């Protein structure tokens, strides 16, 4: 058991089906305006909306994405050699990546490994936001080792996808 290392499984996050669309639309508008100004810190209103959306009650029926990530986490946990595993989300779901990391730091973890469910390059979350969070965490907590297991090898992803095809759609026998 490794009581000094933890893993954060990061999912994109999605808004629950029963949340008022106007709430999410306002959040996305404020986020877009902030990003256009190249400002990192949220306004008080954006932070309030972000918290409200992330903490919205969820069920498998209203947010199958979050429960899908949790299912992956449950399957991944026994494969991590005793490392603690938590989930986090880039947007819409709690906890945020930053909050998940802060919780682990407060619990005394010395090494935190981040891995994303987002496999492809080019996405703002996996390619820009998460590396930015790593940089900020290292500055804030220089004694904590934070690593991001990304990008994924294209050949590895291709093998994974080919295996899934073979499993889900068996080749007919001649």
Role assignments for model-derived ranges:
Residues 1-174:
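Active-site-proximal alpha-helix that buttresses catalytic centers in soluble enzyme cores
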